[in-house]
Amino acid sequence: MATSTMALSSSTFAGKAVKLSPSSSEITGNGRVTMRKTATKAKPASSGSPWYGPDRVKYLGPFSGESPSYLTGEFPGDYGWDTAGLSADPETFAKNRELEVIHCRWAMLGALGCVFPELLARNGVKFGEAVWFKAGSQIFSEGGLDYLGNPSLVHAQSILAIWACQVVLMGAVEGYRIAGGPLGEVVDPLYPGGSFDPLGLADDPEAFAELKVKEIKNGRLAMFSMFGFFVQAIVTGKGPLENLADHLADPVNNNAWAFATNFVPGK
């Protein structure tokens, strides 16, 4: 996760831009609609955007120094920082950028899934185990796992069945995102649009470019959050909101330094 946070590229989108309308042959030739076409060269969303181009926001503001020549501000999330040279090779740049965006999306969903059930439980909503790393383990109990604490919804007793469902359902969605499906072909798997954008949020190019920046910024924060949730679970055995409540109640004794100096694995 930490590695993907530093990655800045996508194998399928590097060096490409959105073409808003398909050609007539795409519409009438084979009866299928292409979700989003790409051209050969990416074009900045707006000359006045603070997030793109040579005058974009940098990682240390006016103290950032000169950015590497290969970080031109063409892609969202490029703050001109690559101390380790991870993006120097164009193919690696493209691959890492795609990995980062996908991990960002998973991390945002994961962070919400870790916090929201615990938030509901702390406000009186009863639906079984709310702590994220404890909820899944209930499937190994004798009674199995009831989704939302209601056996009439989904009652799971087999981890293999859950795994198979995940593979089939998520595999189908990912396959559609990458290779297209009955609702249309996908040319840009990283930003497929079409059925993946039912609200039409990407219809306006400038708004779409800004949304890409918001996505990558929030996704990076979410990846760090998930890493923090993992560490908290191992060290304290509690959920993130319970840890936060403990810290606010007694910040002197409940903080990262106090746990780091007293942590003994297995206890």
Curated annotation (Swiss-Prot):
Localization terms from the record: Plastid, Chloroplast thylakoid membrane
Membrane topology field: Multi-pass membrane protein
Cited Pfam families: Chloroa_b-bind
UniProt: chlorophyll b 3 binding residues: S158, E174
Positions of chlorophyll a 6 binding: H247, A256
GO molecular function: chlorophyll binding; metal ion binding
Gene3D superfamilies assigned to the protein according to its UniProt record, in alphabetical order: Chlorophyll a/b binding protein domain
Gene Ontology cellular-component annotations: chloroplast thylakoid membrane; photosystem I; photosystem II
Record SUPFAM superfamilies: Chlorophyll a-b binding protein
Positions contributing to chlorophyll a 5 binding: K214, Q232
Entry keyword set: Acetylation, Chlorophyll, Chloroplast, Chromophore, Magnesium, Membrane, Metal-binding, Phosphoprotein, Photosynthesis, Photosystem I, Photosystem II, Plastid, Thylakoid, Transit peptide, Transmembrane, Transmembrane helix
Residues recorded with modification N2-acetylarginine: R36
Main location: plastid
TM stretches of this protein: 101-121, 153-173, 221-241
Residues annotated as binding chlorophyll b 4: Q166, R177
Cofactor binding note: Binds at least 14 chlorophylls (8 Chl-a and 6 Chl-b) and carotenoids such as lutein and neoxanthin.
Cysteine disulfide partners in this protein: none
Binding locations of chlorophyll a 4: N218
A GO biological-process term: response to light stimulus
Residue numbers binding chlorophyll a 1: W81, S87, E100, R220
Entry binding sites for chlorophyll a 3: Q138, L148, E215
Binding site for chlorophyll a 2: H103
Domain description: The N-terminus of the protein extends into the stroma where it is involved with adhesion of granal membranes and post-translational modifications; both are believed to mediate the distribution of excitation energy between photosystems I and II.
Protein name per its UniProtKB record: Chlorophyll a-b binding protein 3C, chloroplastic
Originating gene: CAB3C
